[in-house]
Swiss-Prot record:
GO terms for molecular function: aminomethyltransferase activity; transaminase activity. The glycine cleavage system is composed of four proteins: P, T, L and H. This is Aminomethyltransferase. The gene is gcvT. It comes from the Bacteria. Keywords: Aminotransferase, Transferase. GO terms for biological process: glycine decarboxylation via glycine cleavage system.
Amino acid sequence: MLKTTPLNAAHRAMNAKMVDFGGWDMPLHYGSQLDEHHSVRRDAGMFDVSHMLTVDIHGENVRQFLRGLVANNVDKLTLPGKALYTCMLTPTGGIIDDLIIYFLSESWFRLVVNAGTADKDIDWITGQSRQLAPALTITPRRDLAMIAVQGPNARTKVWNVIPDSQAISENLKPFQSVMLGDYFIARTGYTGEDGFEITLPAGQAADFWQKLHAAGVAPAGLGARDTLRLEAGMNLYGQDMDETVNPLESGLAWTVDLKSERDFTGKQTLLETPVNRQLVGLVLLDKGVLRNHQKVITRQEGEAGEGEITSGGFSPTLNQSIALARIPAGIAAGEQVHVVVRDKQLAAKVVKYPFVRNGQALV
């Protein structure tokens, strides 16, 4: 039996194409993935992300516990409502999950973790807590729903739906959040566009979804969510990284704090392990489509040097095929590589990602 979000009936009422997404019954699209993609880039779209899990951690020493749990430094979180993107690592540096941490008070931090890793994450966090901070209370919030409203007009349309929300959220910077009654409003997202991710009680989600739709926000499914995040150069857990790779070879060095004296799980391995691979962007120069797991040839014939596409597909905004690929370190942006597509080697250019940000092509 597939798990369902509080919006399942709403998706079906909108004639969504439903698919099994990691054990969840989720909308792939509502008729046109392409239209949904463009709605987010040009206006406003909304995604049901209630399958992701909010985890509240309460107690006296939450900050100290998180200092050792994650690779980024939670001491950056000084302003209530501020958010931090980070990874949890295994002792050998592999990525257990990527997540967002919100600082709400010294005794209350909120984590948002991926759906497919939620059970594993809870087991890991509670296991670490039992050892290091047994007095903490760890609460998975399955009573909450989450809706992401994204696009250049997303915030304005949310303000039109939630009374008094503009005054309290208009001055939020990216990666800041605020509570407004039952709404937890965060200026975050997974599309490369502006917008909010809004957490609210599950019982209120369907009504809020309908009000957003009435305000001109287009529903968007997992298909558009994937093409948008790929254009934005944002990693997808299970494709671009997992426990077999570390953040330094996954384009996530910026989320790892190795400079402070603070210790965290996996730090020693990261310090001792040479970084032989890197995650890069690819733009296909020949005709064809880049797909996950295609082999990337990074050297001339006879020399070592192979990589693999981790996420690939067609970019509706750029109207060409793009990919994220893990290749040997030392290959610079601007260099040409070849991707093995069936029995052919197609030329591609290495680029710095993101490919698109705030509706504008960057490559």
